[in-house]
Every structure is written in C-alpha cells, then in structure tokens.
C-alpha cells in the first residue's frame, strides 16, 4: 500500500514537471485603497471576456493563465471604474496599481508593454493638462472673459498638437509594433480618410498584418467609398409618409445630406440657417436630404414641422 501511494506521488510530480504549457504570471500589488478581487478582462467587440480572476490578500494578487498570442486586455479592480491596459503574453509581469492615483499605476514585464507604457505616459500628461485648461475655461466662461476663453482655446489646440507630435514620435520609433497599430485602431473615428491613410502608412508591414492593423485597413476601404471626389454610395430610407426614397433619385445640381435628430440641440439650433440656405439656393438647383437618427417617429415629425424643414426627409 505504501509503495502504491509512493508511486502515485512520483507520477503526480512527474506529470507536473512535464506541464510545459506557456503561461503568463501577473504579480500585483494594490495601494491607495482596498479590494477583494482583481480581474483580467478582454474586450471582444461589444462583449467582455474574463481571462482570469484573483483574490486580493494583504494588498497582493496573482493572475495566471495562458494565451495563444499577444492579447490586449485590462486589469480591473473590483469596485473601481476603468482599468489598466496590459498586452498579455506568456511571460512574467508586475502590476503596481494605485487606486488613489490611477495615473501612478504601472505594469511592466515585456518589450511590448514597455512601448504601451510610453503611450500611457504622454496620455496621462495630456489628460492632466487638459483638465487644468478645462477648469480655467469654465471660470473664464462664468466670468464672461472672452479674451481669456480665446487664449485658453488656443492653449488647448496647441496641447493637442504637441500630444500628436509626441505620439507620432513613439509611432516612428516603434512602427512595426502591435501597440502602434492598436493605438491607431482606437482612433478610427477621429480621422478622415486622408488623415487615416497617412497614419496607416507610417506603420510597418508586421503592424499592418495584426488584427488592429487589419481593422484599420478595413476602415480605410470603407472610407474610400465616401472620400472627397468619389460618387456617394446610394441608400434608401422611408419618408415621413412611409414611402421609400433613395438618395440617387433626388435630382439637383448640389445635394446636401444632413444628419440630425429631434433631440440634438446643436442640430436644432442650426436648422434656421439651413432653412435660409435652402430658400436662397433651392431655386438654383440645391437639394437637401435630411437623415434623422430619431427612434421616436412622432418626435421626428414634430421637429420637421416646428423647424419648417420643407425639403426631403
């Protein structure tokens, strides 16, 4: 019996030793607050997958697991908003999370994570300065100090230019990295076609071949169909009386497609100017097609009537 137990123990140890599956190990500490659990979460489209979960004991935790390849994820502390970006690989990481001052948190462990930390650093710096400018702008607005407001607006624009220049420098130094493609993919809807193509062309071939790189390429292909100089693709929507109306069926020398909604304050505020433009130029061949984002048909119809929008809807 003793020999059998000994044999089983030897087998168990041997099997354990033979387990060569690559794993990631994230050893972390939490300061500036308390927490019960920490999660490693991955965003997949509109869903969020839990890759790992670990309890927090005496301010420490350890997340372990295995990934098939480089995986962007977030370390999220239970009960806290947001999370810390980590590019998970089967390697060892350290994560020092500061709940009181999240910008002081830091994750280290791989070359890829080191590149990501460069982006995080300039983002945190920009965020701090933007917050200060915003607070000053609110004060100037309350005091109706238009000169100060203009000055602060110029400072903000310069801050954004400086941030983009720093980001471009990191991109240039790491053009072929997964992180460079990932950062750009997160800004798909901030750039028009020309700007996105310009940014994409700074990436290396390996970066372009990553999943975020492919996402950017797909976006560029879609934007190319509506780029300046291209024939706008046709689409068909129902009019207020329920009849289908295609964009190409509207004939005019110049066509304006106006996206709006009854609940959109800036849209409604601009409508009087659009009405004036239509009344002035419609006799010369201007046509307008307003595309509403309303889900409430009654609110849509009422806004059309109230704002005296007499063109195509």
Where in the sequence are the language-model features?
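N-terminal "domain-start" segment that seeds a small globular fold
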Residues: 214-248
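Short solvent-exposed coil/turn linkers within tandem alpha-helical repeat scaffolds
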Residues: 173, 177, 190, 206-214
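Alpha-helical repeat scaffolds
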Residues: 195-204, 231-239
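Structural microenvironment flanking redox-active thiols in thiol-disulfide oxidoreductases
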Residues: 269-312
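A non-transmembrane, solvent-exposed segment enriched in polar/low-complexity residues
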Residues: 18-165
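Amphipathic alpha-helical coiled-coil segments
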Residues: 157-176, 194-198
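Conserved redox-active cysteine motifs that mediate thiol-disulfide chemistry
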Residues: 251-255, 259-279
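Bacterial Sec-dependent N-terminal signal peptides
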Residues: 1-29
């Amino acid at each position: 019996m003793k020999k059998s137990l000994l044999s089983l123990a030897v087998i168990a140890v041997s099997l354990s030793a033979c387990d060569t599956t690559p794993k990631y190990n994230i050893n972390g500490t939490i300061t500036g607050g308390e927490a019960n659990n920490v999660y490693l979460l991955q965003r997949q489209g509109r869903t969020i997958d839990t890759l790992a979960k670990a309890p927090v004991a005496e301010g420490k935790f350890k997340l372990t697991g295995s990934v098939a390849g480089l995986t962007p994820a977030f370390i999220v502390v239970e009960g806290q908003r947001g999370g810390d970006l980590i590019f998970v690989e089967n390697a060892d990481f350290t994560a020092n999370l500061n709940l009181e001052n999240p910008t002081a948190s830091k994750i280290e462990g791989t070359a890829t994570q080191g590149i990501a930390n460069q982006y995080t650093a300039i983002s945190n710096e920009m965020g701090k300065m933007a917050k200060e400018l915003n607070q000053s702008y609110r004060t100037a607005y309350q005091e109706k100090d238009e000169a100060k407001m203009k000055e602060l607006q110029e400072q903000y624009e310069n801050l954004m230019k400086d941030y983009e220049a720093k980001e471009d420098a990191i991109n240039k130094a790491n053009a072929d990295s997964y992180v460079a493609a990932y950062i750009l993919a997160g800004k798909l809807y901030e750039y028009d076609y020309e700007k996105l193509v310009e940014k994409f062309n700074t990436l290396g071939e390996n970066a372009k071949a990553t999943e975020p790189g492919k996402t950017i390429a797909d976006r560029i292909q879609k934007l190319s169909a509506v780029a300046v100089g291209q024939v706008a693709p046709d689409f068909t929507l129902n009019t207020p009386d329920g009849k289908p109306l295609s964009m190409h069926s509207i004939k005019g020398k110049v066509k304006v497609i106006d996206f709006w909604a009854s609940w959109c304050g800036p849209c409604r505020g601009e409508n009087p100017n659009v009405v004036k433009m239509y009344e002035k130029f419609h006799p010369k061949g201007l046509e307008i097609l307003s595309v509403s984002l309303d889900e409430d048909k009654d609110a849509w119809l009422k806004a059309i009537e109230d704002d005296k929008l007499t063109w195509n809807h």
